Amino acid sequence: MRIGIFTDTYRPQVNGVVSSITTLERELRKKGHKVYIITTTDPDAPAVEPNVLRIPSMEFKPLPQYRLGLLYSSRIIKKIKKLNLDIIHSQTEWGVGTFARFAAINLEIPLVHTYHTLYEYYTHYITRGHFTVPAKKLAAAISRFYCEKCDALIVPTRKVEDILYSYDVDKVMNIIPTGLDLDRFYRKNYTEEEIKFMRESFGIEENEFLCVYIGRIAQEKSIDVLIDMFSKIKDKTFKFMIVGRGPITEDLKKQAEDLGIADRVIFAGEVPHDKVPVYYQMGDVFLNASISETQGLTFVEAMAAETPVNARYDLNLEDLLVKNEAGLVYRNEEEFVNNIMLLKKDKEFRNNIVKNAFNVSQDYTAEKFGERVEAVYKKTIEEYDINESFTIFRGEKYIQQIRRWTSIKSSGRSPWSK
């Protein structure tokens, strides 16, 4: 197959969506498919990128790490047409996602969409605390509109499926969790001496119990909740390491100082991608309090690393942790603390959790991810009916309007530049 993946975010950016796309791209190419990436321009992108087509874009001010691409460019459409795509796979509901829909209509190509992000948990970046309820309703409306107008819909977890149904999305959904390169997280890759050396480099003694959080340092991750609950553990042999970077780092440092635990909370900062696995190995337990995750890939990484997970209860953890006794969940401060104490005191219990978690993680391999998405592509192409697809896009009149609009040539690139 000749596959076009449309996304607002791609390398050199680093985030969960980019990781998912990179993994999918590689697995599809292993299977002999031709994969093209259609994404936004980026000032840090390489000058030459085989099979990558970049759409003029500009910085999105509320979230500077993201870029907003043109909704349409006749020049880019002509280039896409020459690719002779069999399927278009959009990874966003916004700029490039809209472009993907226009391309699917104009070029009569089936459209598959993956819904990655629960926007209702991120509206604070735009509203700054104002109009929160209307913003969440708008996010739901946009999600519903886009998801219903594709030929096939992929979601990563049952939680996302349930939320989209609550948005009144009337569409059959394919639940396909993102796959990961798990090999690099396995404990067998690291010696006890290497792990001990890394712990000592941060002042962690052999008898100390290290809790770790790895991820973006942002409001929706609820790291402040973790720090507050961790402060209830008065035993000074317990320490908490926060790995990552983000806009609220300084606020969290102040919180730790105010709680009198600054000497037990370690801010490791951002670490190179290839060094992340050893930080899981350093930890005695992986902590998380976020309920904004669509699937929680860091949970799977910790499970593959044989580091037990203690996470705030959320629906997406039912299949991942609860059902298979592959990790611990808490609903309040008391359960949070009790879980940590249990993992420290009961070695047999901890070993059973770790064993179950490792086995569950094997269902999240990159290879299985590629196979599942490939199957959706094949089914969508087989069942594709151009007339029915046009109906999905709200009828012939709507199609004619889009085609008239998209026949207008792009008037220029500024400020949509690299």
Where are these regions (language model features)?
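Conserved acidic donor-binding segment of nucleotide-sugar-dependent glycosyltransferases
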Residues: 323-334, 342-348
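Short alpha-helical donor nucleotide-sugar binding micro-motif in glycosyltransferases
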Residues: 147, 270-271, 278-283
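Donor nucleotide-sugar binding/catalytic pocket of nucleotide-sugar-dependent glycosyltransferases
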Residues: 39, 53-56, 133, 139-194
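N-terminal subdomain of nucleotide-sugar transferases
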Residues: 1-56, 374, 378, 396-418
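Aromatic "clamp/platform" in nucleotide-sugar-dependent glycosyltransferases that forms part
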Residues: 291
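A conserved mid-protein helix/loop that constitutes part of the nucleotide-sugar donor-binding site
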Residues: 19, 209-232, 240, 247-253
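Nucleotide-activated donor-binding/catalytic signature segment of Leloir-type glycosyltransferases, i.e.
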Residues: 251-271
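Short hydrophobic beta-strand element within catalytic cores of glycosyltransferases
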Residues: 308-311
